[in-house]
A protein has these predicted regions:
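Acidic/histidine-rich alpha-helical segments that form the ligand environment
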Residues: 92-111, 115-119
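Hydrophobic alpha-helical transmembrane segments
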Residues: 135-150
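Membrane-helix exit/interface motif
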Residues: 31-33, 49-53, 70-82, 105, ...
């Protein structure tokens, strides 16, 4: 196996793991974090979500979230260069799923909702009403992120299998 083949397999593996980790994180929010927040008073839920949205912006999360985007972009280019070799289509689909379903969805839908929530005083009646609008919409887009991240991981694992020498 050439060094280029080895590097490609490592890049696919790293990207698949990143997608899987992000999918797991989003799954946790879809499965129980948001449900738990819905069970507590609105003021506490808004305060908790505001805190989560601040704390999540840390080096480790950003390295995983953006690093997976960077490796996905790299795989898109690599898939184009290798076309139509085995695994190229799976690499392209997996990478595109992560970029569209996680990066684009996060930037266009979840982040603006989080920013709007951050501007609210949790003790206000406006915050309570906003919370009831925020949760269903935020969850919907988070489900999209969960499904696309896990699907991207699956496509990339298929690419890993198909691209092996």
């Amino acid at each position: 196996m050439s060094i280029v083949d080895t590097l490609l397999l490592l890049l696919i593996l790293a990207t698949a793991l990143g997608c899987g980790l992000m999918g797991g994180l989003f799954f946790a929010f879809s499965n129980f974090v948001m449900t738990a927040l819905e069970r507590i008073p609105e003021q506490s839920a808004v305060t908790a979500m505001q805190s989560i949205n601040k704390v999540v912006l840390n080096r480790l999360f950003l390295a995983l979230f953006l690093g997976t985007a960077a490796t996905s972009i790299g795989l898109l280019f690599w898939a184009y260069q290798r076309w139509p070799l085995p695994g190229s289509l799976c690499m392209a689909i997996g990478s595109a799923l992560y970029l569209a379903g996680n990066i684009v969805v996060t930037l266009l839908f979840n982040v603006p909702k989080n920013q709007a929530l951050a501007r609210l005083d949790p003790a206000s009646s406006e915050a309570a009403a906003a919370w009831h609008r925020y949760v269903p919409s935020w969850n919907r887009w988070n489900h999209v992120r969960t499904i696309t991240a896990l699907a991207a991981a699956a496509w990339l694992m298929a690419a890993l299998w198909l691209a092996r020498p």
